[in-house]
């Protein structure tokens, strides 16, 4: 474990701040400029559409009656704390894992603020093909998905990267 935070993954916490600010500023812009369900087409397959998500990804548990708000709040806080502890234990040079953890934390905190402030998450990125729409999402959701993808990728390539840096042939 690194002896000070500058040598640890906490050095990457600027990504958390960047994701959080981009997410919150974009949602504030949507709330200030759109009515609920208002939509503006930007591309033939992409709209800005203001929707409220009372559940999790893909509106999971959105009609559960309200208790899910507190479950998702607890999960967001728990994962953010856990990943922050892991960041402190990681060397700063482990860029892929540090980037992944900070993307997930930034996204989790962005959606957490929405849940606490509004009781729902503001979603507005609406991709579709013909009449089939992918569930709307936001910058926080994107960061969480990219972070999760990097964690999965790291699980496949981390051992190979270690062997390369140690000069070991497979």
UniProtKB/Swiss-Prot annotation:
It holds the Pfam family Peptidase_A8. The active site is at 123, 141. Signal peptide: none annotated. GO terms for biological process: proteolysis. The keyword Chloroplast does not apply. The keyword Cell membrane applies. Its EC number is 3.4.23.36. Keywords: Aspartyl protease, Cell inner membrane, Cell membrane, Hydrolase, Membrane, Protease, Transmembrane, Transmembrane helix. The chain crosses the membrane at residues 12-32, 67-87, 94-113, 139-159. InterPro entries: Peptidase_A8. Pathway: Protein modification; lipoprotein biosynthesis (signal peptide cleavage). NCBIfam families: lspA (TIGR00077). Belongs to the peptidase A8 family. This is Lipoprotein signal peptidase. The gene is lspA.
């Amino acid at each position: 474990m690194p002896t000070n935070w500058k040598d640890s993954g906490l050095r990457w916490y600027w990504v958390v701040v960047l994701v959080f600010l981009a997410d919150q500023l974009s949602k504030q812009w949507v709330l200030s400029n759109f009515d609920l369900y208002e939509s503006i087409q930007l591309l033939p397959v992409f709209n800005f559409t203001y929707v409220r998500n009372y559940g999790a990804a893909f509106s999971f548990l959105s009609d559960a009656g309200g208790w899910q708000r507190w479950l998702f709040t607890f999960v967001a806080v728990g994962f953010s704390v856990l990943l922050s502890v892991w960041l402190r234990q990681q060397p700063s040079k482990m860029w892929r894992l540090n980037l992944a953890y900070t993307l997930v934390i930034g996204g989790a905190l962005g959606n957490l603020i929405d849940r606490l402030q509004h009781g729902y998450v503001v979603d507005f990125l609406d991709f579709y093909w013909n009449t089939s729409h992918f569930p709307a999402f936001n910058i926080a959701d994107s960061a969480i998905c990219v972070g999760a993808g990097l964690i999965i990728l790291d699980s496949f390539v981390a051992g190979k990267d270690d062997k390369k840096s140690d000069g070991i042939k497979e």
